[in-house]
Amino acid sequence: MMYPYMTLDDGTEIIHSELISKDGTEHVIVHFERPTEDGFDDARCELPSYTWTDVHGFSKEELALFDEMVRANAHLFYKYAACGGIE
């Protein structure tokens, strides 16, 4: 299940998964998606490793900003993932 987190000024939607137990560790997937004329730009970051996958359309500069934001908000992603999203 994915839960909404925030919408940026450029229309980029940020959503996150519920807690995912894998190999004895709790993981959260953070997904970024922005509409374009041809579909969507998108990217995923898996916590706690901060591994980026499925990156399409975002620049390196945008990804660096997203990475900074994910790292600064990781505790909130875990909190909201554990309780079923922002209430």
Which ranges hold each PLM region?
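Structured catalytic/translocation cores of nucleotide/phosphate-coupled proteins
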Residues: 4, 9, 40-43, 61, ...
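Generic detector of leucine side chains in alpha-helical contexts
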Residues: 8, 19, 47, 63-65, ...
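Acidic, low-complexity intrinsically disordered segments
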Residues: 56-87
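A short, structured beta-strand/loop element
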Residues: 16-58
